[in-house]
A protein has these predicted regions:
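Glycine-rich Rossmann-fold phosphate-binding loop(s) that bind the pyrophosphate
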Residues: 148-149
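N-terminal Rossmann-fold NAD(P) dinucleotide-binding loop
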Residues: 152-153
Length: 319
């Protein structure tokens, strides 16, 4: 039986090696150099690397690749045009980290609302505070949620448990929505001033690049908080620094920045109303690789049967 050469990162090896079907010939890599050497043999590939440029180089070298799998939900660092030209199927990690990222958003909102960072700093100084530095309740506050994929849906679900009034931005109003808590892409900017929280959970695409700029920040409430767990590219960072420095908006909770890692001399670090969490939201759990491995193994079964693998990325839309 001719086997299907499958090239995989060594990081996933302990979770899949003894569970792979017999029609798979696995080849694992531990470095960029090994990946580049193995890539031309791959019919199926899982090439995830921290350095997106290295990963793109390996993908480019995989000239016979039919299916590329990734643990990452965002695929903005991949050569999507090349994959589309080659007819390669791409599955991503959509939903793998949705639970922990949704929890991170709630944590960020509570951190800002209750002034928790100031509480921690007081503890470090061994100072007993006589009043709370934060006096905002989530109850009854209004949140605008841009991005309604797997992560967005879980954010909405969790915020509703806190009685937050959530409005989601979707391409079209669902027929059963009843209307008021759904906005379309051409409507949300005009209503930015209505919201206490503006939460970004959109994919990084040309359409979302710089979607929050000086005009959008100026339209927000002066008491509002911007939360970004999407990509740094969706926010004009210079405009955000200016808005935070002048207190045009109250604060920002930023899991993502431009660039990453954020240089030590970047002005964001020195702003007391900027909360920077170093793109840790998706890593704040220990099930990422387990879930990804299980999904990959299930998809191998579908692939062998000629069925659709999931979740498949639209290589034109970029998500």
């Amino acid at each position: 039986m001719t086997k299907t050469v499958t090239v995989l990162s060594g990081l996933i090896r302990p979770l899949v090696e003894n569970r792979l079907p017999d029609w798979i010939e696995p080849k694992f890599f531990a470095s960029k150099e090994e990946a580049l050497e193995l890539a031309p043999q791959a019919e199926i590939g899982w090439f995830d690397m921290y350095d997106k440029k290295d990963m793109a180089a390996v993908i480019s070298a995989a000239t016979g690749l039919k299916w590329l799998n990734s643990i990452y939900a965002g695929v903005d660092g991949m050569p999507l045009d090349l994959l589309r030209e080659r007819g390669t199927v791409l599955t991503n990690g959509a939903g793998i980290n949705a639970i922990t990222i949704a929890e991170y958003v709630v944590m960020g909102m509570l951190t800002v609302a209750k002034g928790y960072r100031d509480v921690v700093r007081a503890q470090e100084r061994r100072e007993w505070l006589i009043d709370s530095p934060g006096k905002v309740e989530l109850f009854g506050s209004k949140a605008l949620l841009l991005g309604y994929g797997a992560i967005g849906k879980l954010i909405e679900e969790r915020l509703k448990a806190f009685a937050v009034d959530v409005t989601v931005v979707r391409r079209s109003r669902p027929r059963d929505s009843g209307g008021p808590n759904t906005l379309t892409p051409d409507q949300w900017r005009a209503q930015l001033g209505d919201f206490d929280w503006v939460i970004l959970a959109v994919p990084a695409t040309p359409e979302t690049d710089g979607m929050i700029g000086a005009a959008e920040l100026a339209a927000m409430k002066p008491t509002a908080t911007l939360i970004n767990i999407a990509r740094g590219s969706v926010v004009d960072q210079d405009a955000l620094v200016a808005a935070l420095d002048s207190r045009q908006i109250a604060s920002a909770f930023l899991d993502v920045t431009t660039p990453e890692p954020l240089p030590s001399d970047d002005p964001l670090w020195s702003l007391d109303n900027a909360h920077i969490t170093m793109h840790l939201s998706g890593r704040a759990q220990d099930k990422m690789f387990v879930r990804s491995a299980q999904r990959f193994l299930e998809n191998l079964g579908r692939w062998k049967k000629g069925e659709a693998v999931e979740p498949r990325v639209d290589l034109t839309l970029g998500y």
